[in-house]
Swiss-Prot record:
Coiled coil residues, start to end: none
Protein's recorded name: Large ribosomal subunit protein bL19
UniProt record similarity statement: Belongs to the bacterial ribosomal protein bL19 family.
Gene: rplS
GO biological process, any: translation
Gene Ontology CC terms, in alphabetical order: cytosolic large ribosomal subunit
Domain of life of the source: Bacteria
């Protein structure tokens, strides 16, 4: 059974995914389709924030990015690593954390400070 799953997954896996850990500041460029029919247009929309969670394995692996929007409203988006709608993922800063899930950042008001990792 595992051989069949691995054979199917190899067709859909992306190879150009950078190493991401919780606490990293990333910019995810997402392909957004606007309009319908002949007015259909595709553009790239960046989403920049801190990775607060990574879950799963294989094709089902995903990560959650949190950013502070207008009026200090927190916005979270969940991205599958191997999604065809993700154009690229850039790691802007590497964060040093002691937790795998950074849910406590949801309660923090104002600017979030995470120490930088030196790799």
């Amino acid at each position: 059974m595992d051989k069949i799953i691995n054979a199917v997954e190899t067709n859909y896996k992306k190879e150009d995914i950078p190493e991401i850990r919780p606490g990293d500041t990333v910019r995810v460029n997402v392909k957004v389709v606007e309009g319908e029919g002949e007015k259909k247009r595709e553009r790239i929309q960046p989403f920049e924030g801190i990775v607060i969670k990574i879950r799963g394995a294989g094709l089902g692996r995903s990560f959650t990015v949190r950013k502070m929007g207008a009026d200090r409203v927190g916005v979270e988006r969940i991205f599958p690593f191997h999604s065809p709608s993700i154009s690229s993922i850039e790691v802007l800063k590497k964060g040093k954390t002691r937790r795998a899930k950074l849910y406590y950042l949801r309660d923090v008001k104002g600017k979030i400070r995470i120490k930088e990792r030196k790799d």
